[in-house]
């Protein structure tokens, strides 16, 4: 059993290394925000009476695909490096930061759906980040 546990940990570490390069603090932040967003989304759906398992499954699928997209961004950086184009993980970092901002926006929207007051300036910033500056 102990050997299986060690083997499983080694396989997981190799997979993470292949998919994301090294695990960075930005990935830890993204993972944390993904979990918080999913949790706040569940609570907001419960408060508004819109909770259902199909929507929850779609939410989990979307969260998984965030990490698929980040892995693809890392692979693009790796391919570019292999052909002599040094990106310094620019595509990977851009993807991670994009999804971090997206998760933050969603968390604040969930807070509003739960009835938690969201400061006007924060609402304006979210509108700008979403590309809807008219609000």
From Swiss-Prot:
Keyword Repeat found: no
GO CC annotations, alphabetized: plasma membrane
Keywords: Cell membrane, Membrane, Transmembrane, Transmembrane helix
Transmembrane portions of the chain: 7-25, 29-51, 64-85, 89-108
Family annotation (Pfam families): Phage_holin_4_1 (PF05105)
The keyword Transmembrane belongs to this UniProt entry's keyword annotation: yes
InterPro entries membership: Phage_holin_4_1
Family note: Belongs to the bacteriophage holin family. Cp-1 holin subfamily.
UniProt name for this protein: Uncharacterized protein BH0965
